[in-house]
UniProtKB/Swiss-Prot annotation:
Keywords: Amino-acid biosynthesis, Disulfide bond, Lysine biosynthesis, NAD, Oxidoreductase
Source organism phylogeny: Eukaryota, Fungi, Dikarya, Ascomycota, Saccharomycotina
Protein name: Saccharopine dehydrogenase [NAD(+), L-lysine-forming]
Active site residues according to the UniProt entry: 79 (proton acceptor), 98 (proton donor)
GO BP terms, alphabetized: lysine biosynthetic process via aminoadipic acid
Name of the gene: LYS1
Classification via Gene3D superfamilies: NAD(P)-binding Rossmann-like Domain
Amino acid sequence: MSKSPVILHLRAETKPLEARAALTPSTTKQLLDAGFEIYVEESSQSTFDIKEYEAVGAKIVPEGSWKTAPKERIIFGLKELPENETFPLIHEHIQFAHCYKDQAGWQDVLKRFPQGNGILYDLEFLENDQGRRVAAFGFYAGFAGAAIGVLDWSFKQLNGNTKGTKGEGEGGELPGVTPYPNENELIKDVKIELEKALTKNGGQYPKCLVIGALGRCGSGAIDLFKKIGIPDDNIAKWDMAETAKGGPFQEIVDSDIFINCIYLSKPIPPFINKEILNNENRKLTTIVDVSADTTNPHNPIPVYEIATVFNEPTVEVKLDKGPKLSVCSIDHLPSLLPREASEFFAKDLMPSLLELPNRDTSPVWVRAKQLFDKHVARLDKE
């Protein structure tokens, strides 16, 4: 007797300016061809047109209809569900939930699953037999983060870098950014702003420091820097060997742009703190915390407290000395290039999705379920 087909329900993303999709039209077709049933919600913010899904044979349903969908559907999305919703979750969910690393409010996020006998397969923790993530947005997170870093540095060169309040001319923060249709358009815009800044400052390129340079995210940041023409000598590429001695690091203070791309898996000494930054001779004016462990008690960049958003991409670090310093801590940076990031991610995820009919025995899914059970058990204790 053959198994019933896996039924996936692609929910519409609700996070503001989240234009990515967990399934693309091309990966939807692959799954349909493999015998899956797929429902796709209409979405007001997806980079993909609903007609693209319809054309490959998906069933189109209204936005938000997953809440009343039959229990046998697996609800598939990317970002977390809205915080103001608290009803129990009855389905199996595949998504990034951000509740396994003691983030603020993790219990409230996680408890909804056992309350409804639902299951969470967290995309961040789908790992192969070697312990590596099967799919990640890291490359485009680093790429987009570096782009915003250069835009912010250029903005400061052009508009002055004195401290002030938002919107008061000099001292204002970087204006909002919106998703780009493709990588080339983003590169073009960043190059234009960089060239203006170089004209103003006598052709001095920024000194950039990337921590986590050997990973997906760091390689994305370095790729952006190279594609817009920043000389290789101006890009310091740090990884675990360089940070082994423990921070804070004066080398960050002496750079113009600092990009943090590490994956935080355990407590480490901070890379920087307000004491080392509060210096008249500081060069650093732009931090991009791609890792965005904003609410993690072990955040290695403990100089800001909010996650920024695309329409207000930076927040000022309050310091008494030195030039103005801003942090970008957007936690869904790949949305700046939603189509390419979605295709890249979905392609990597495809072999694991094709294993969903065997999720009770397939190692990737079994490990994800065991991790879910482990953290649910913590709910009772904490």
